[in-house]
Design a protein with these regions (language model features):
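Envelope-exposed proteins and targeting segments
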Residues: 56-58, 72-74, 80, 88, ...
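Short secondary-structure boundary motifs at beta->alpha junctions and helix caps
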Residues: 76, 84-91, 162-203
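Surface-exposed short loop/turn segments
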Residues: 29-43, 47-51, 111-162, 230-232
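A structural "domain/chain start" motif
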Residues: 29-98, 208-232
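N-terminal secretory signal peptides
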Residues: 1-26
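Sec-exported extracytoplasmic/periplasmic mature domains
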Residues: 105, 109-113, 139, 202-210
Length: 232
């Protein structure tokens, strides 16, 4: 049997190799190229206002929240019945725990009641640390086609920086109904529910150290995790 490829001129062998390479790349184009339109990126943008509390003299470091793997993502979560899923082709600008940390820092800054606040990664000289656990940050559907209710549930702990003692703990649960069953309306509901949660967290946190020093603060045990009701 004649082995043609072994005796072909170099130029022709190059053509065959090049043609084969093009065929391989053509067959893989669906794998290495874009599979569809890029996801729409949405900004978490709640409104912040000055807190209706007395100013404080201590400084605060805000830790990134603990979160389950299902919430530690930039995807926008939805809950229908017993199923946790995500909106297609929609993303937050960052993973949800990082967004929560950044927005809490911003909320304390815009409260105008605290001299210094920063993320723990910024190595601020803090008197207290705000630790959080993110339990819910999702759009919850009670019906197949109706507009969802956004649920934000954050457990907050104020911790003494010097002794690492938990001064107080509170569970903040906020909800907001979307006006319509579309992504912009759902994002608006996230902004509303998250904004209310941040405002409550700021007001409560600013009052805790003063209560601790006066002896009236009562540390509260972290409440048990909420169990989602499943559709019957």
């Amino acid at each position: 049997m004649t082995k043609y490829s072994a005796h072909l001129p170099l130029s022709r062998r190059g053509i065959l190799v090049g043609t084969a390479s093009l065929l391989v790349l053509s067959g893989c184009s669906g794998l290495i190229g874009p599979s569809g339109p890029p996801p729409q990126i949405y900004v978490l943008q709640p409104e912040f206002h000055a807190a209706d509390t007395p100013p404080v003299r201590w400084q605060l470091a805000v830790a990134a929240p603990d979160a389950s793997e299902s919430l530690d993502t930039a995807r926008i979560a939805l809950h229908r019945g017993a199923n946790l899923d995500y909106f297609a082709d929609a993303r937050w600008t960052d993973a949800v725990p990082m967004l929560i940390q950044a927005k809490l820092v911003e909320a304390f800054e815009k409260s105008t009641k605290i001299p210094a606040v920063a993320a723990t990664s910024d190595a601020v000289r803090a008197d207290y640390v705000l630790e959080t656990t993110l339990r819910d940050f999702e759009a919850r559907y009670d019906s197949q086609n109706g507009a969802p209710t956004v649920v934000v549930d954050i457990v907050v702990r104020v911790v003494s920086e010097g002794h690492s003692d938990v001064v107080a703990t509170h569970d903040f649960h906020n909800e907001a109904s979307a006006a319509r069953n579309d992504i912009p309306s759902v994002v608006a509901a996230f902004n509303q529910a998250a904004g209310a949660a941040f405002a409550d967290i700021v007001a409560w946190s600013l009052s805790v150290p003063a209560a601790e020093k006066s002896g009236s603060a009562t540390p509260v045990a972290t409440p048990p995790a909420r169990r989602h009701k499943t559709a019957s």
